[in-house]
């Protein structure tokens, strides 16, 4: 039976990445420490929201503390992690819900990603959960990369804002004229 709880109290890496071409990409969260790599499949919208909420939470905590908990205002370019996902990309589960929290005493961000639940009432079965603890610096870098990965997809049509395929698309604002 697969592990049901993946805990990373101090991961070497916690990143988001994709596999596939723009328009047909699959998104993944990946946590790595010295002993293991855990990958979870996630939706593009979840990645976008997670990055935004991390920055919002860190900004809020920073503004409410006299020393700002020494939270950086933005990511440090020296911390940039633009390397690919660890291969092979074999997701343990698909993320359904995510939660964020700030531990004031330890001064770190906690992220919890739970698998999609299909309403099974079996008390013996436990949905997989990925728990990751990040420093404020690592969280800012994750949010930066999340934004970069999300925006690396297809360009938007200047008329209708729908994504453009490499061969163009039938634009609804132009009455179906190819763009």
Model-derived features with residue positions:
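N-terminal auxiliary interaction/assembly segments of multi-subunit proteins
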Residues: 59-63, 70-74, 144, 151
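Short, structured motif recognition centered on aromatic/hydrophobic residues
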Residues: 25-30, 50, 54, 109-113, ...
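Short microdomains enriched in Cys/His and/or Lys/Arg
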Residues: 177-179
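The feature marks the first
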Residues: 1-52, 56-60, 64
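Short cysteine/histidine-rich zinc-coordinating motifs and their immediately flanking basic loops
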Residues: 168-175
